Regions:
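Residue-level signal for cytosolic alpha-helical hairpin/rod architecture
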Residues: 45, 126-129, 201
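Cytosol-/stroma-facing membrane-proximal "stalk/adaptor" domains immediately downstream
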Residues: 165-189, 193-218, 230-231
Length: 233
């Protein structure tokens, strides 16, 4: 199945929003149990194999982060919102200075993306090692543990922060009807080059179309994007 082009924002009307909302709601209600079982099996096998095969890389990154700042933690965790608005603790390699959250309030006016997200290409809170692991998406690898725990799936919408969800419309919240993922249609379609509205549309498109083969296609495209990617920050 080919990844379809993004729905243009100019084409999105109230009627089309209602139509998409109805289709997403119907899709999440009618999703076959067989698909969900296969998806969970893929998640467990994929995450376990990923942790095992990538363990040397995980060790190297751990050492680099520790050498950069011996007193700071290697891992960073944050409360995120998952399926049906249930919160969970999401893990990442720390890519910012330890007091990054305290510094955020002074940077909010420099947000480079519209909507309920914060993105800044030259964020001063990012460390030198952090810049590399963000560019290659290596900072996301600890989320494989979230997949094993069942908080996340390998493929699904990006898990938002509670403060982001507080700004969501009822339409935006449709993306919370499925389990969030380590990667998804948004991530392989432009990621930080896309607006918040475009991210929502891509997530809803994924929910409408999701199946085993579509998931595998997104995983394959993610693996290719991790090598030489320059749109992650």
């Amino acid at each position: 199945m080919a990844l379809s082009p993004l729905r243009k924002e100019s084409e999105m009307t109230i009627d089309s929003h209602l139509s998409i909302a109805q289709r997403v709601q119907a899709k999440t209600r009618s999703t076959k149990r067989t698909y969900l079982m296969i998806k969970r099996m893929m998640d467990l096998v994929g995450a376990a194999c990923g942790i095992l095969l990538l363990s040397p890389l995980l060790l190297v990154i751990t050492l680099l982060i520790k050498l950069e700042n011996p007193k700071a933690p290697v891992f960073f965790y944050q409360t995120r919102v998952g399926i049906n608005e249930k919160t969970f603790r999401m893990y990442k390699f720390r890519s910012m200075v330890p007091n990054a959250e305290d510094l955020l309030k002074d940077l909010l006016h420099k947000n480079e993306i519209e909507g309920a997200m914060f993105k800044m290409k030259h964020d001063p809170r990012i460390t030198p090692v952090g810049r590399f692991i963000r560019r290659t998406s290596i900072d996301e690898l600890p989320q494989l543990w979230n997949v094993v725990r069942g908080d996340m799936s390998l493929v699904g919408p990006r898990p938002p922060l509670p403060r982001e969800v507080a700004e969501y419309s009822s339409y935006d919240k449709l993306r919370l009807r499925v389990k969030p993922g380590c990667t998804g249609l948004w991530q392989v379609s432009g990621r930080n080059e896309l607006s918040f509205k475009e991210m929502v549309e891509l997530d809803l498109e994924y929910i409408e179309k999701r199946n085993v083969f579509f998931d595998l296609q997104i995983i394959a495209k993610t693996a290719r994007a991790m090598v030489g990617s320059d749109d992650a920050y």
